[in-house]
Amino acid sequence: MTTSTLDHIVHLTPPGSVEETTKQFRELGFNVIPGGTHADGLTANALVILADHVYLELIWFTQPPEAYPPSSPTRRQREQHKWAARPPGWIDYAFLGNGVLEGTNRISDIINGRAATRLYADEVPGGRTRPDGEVLKWVISAPLKADSILPFFCGDVTDRRLRVPTEPSSNTHHPNSALGIAHIHLLVSAAAFTSTLKEISTVLGSQPLSSTDQEAKWQLSTLNGNQLRPPTLVLATPADEAQAQFVDSHSAPHIYEVGFYAGENGKEGSVTTPFGRVVWVV
């Protein structure tokens, strides 16, 4: 199966910030719809669904760690969460998985087989409950290293249309005319560039469309890309002082910016939210 279909991009904000985050993204011209609380009760989300059927997951922890009793299982689970130490902003991105939890056709088996080493951990079940009570289930395939810049995979057990409600069509229409994802721009240090390029190529199952010693680009697919331009995954080393400061301020490789294709008379240029950079591509 293909392992290069973009599913969603994760944007983290401070604990309990649902109303503030929703307001910020609506002010950017996005249509934000309710998501729900995840199965572990630690995180909740809202969604921005695009016409290419990729979505932004606006996620936050429901409580800060100190809200849980010291040494309690929930406190430990909160402190050990893969995103617990991540600063707010664009923190992760997911490709579409196949929903296989056990057996020989797991995403982890496919990628680890390509790599001839263990890049991905064993699959784990996931899910959340929507505000309307609908229970969603999926399977997560995640990189073995918690601070990896490699994508995780989300494979639906229940119907994806329940997780990503693209109907009614108004869910994917945005006042800013955003149509789909143009690019995800990853920044790494020069020392990490070559090894990261190799690992991403292994995950995608293809070499970059273009590559220099400072930048590589891969074309991704989406579930509704027939009438839309495809997104690009960009891996690069810092090209200016602002990008160098960004790399220096993050302990692990990170998403620098997300680009959006804009329709006619749509937004242009770039904007920085309180926690992430957005670029409009016409």
Question: Where are the regions that the model predicts?
Answer:
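Conserved catalytic-core motifs of GNAT/GCN5-like acyltransferases
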Residues: 32-39
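Glyoxalase I/VOC metalloenzyme domain signal
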Residues: 1-6, 11-31, 43, 50-282
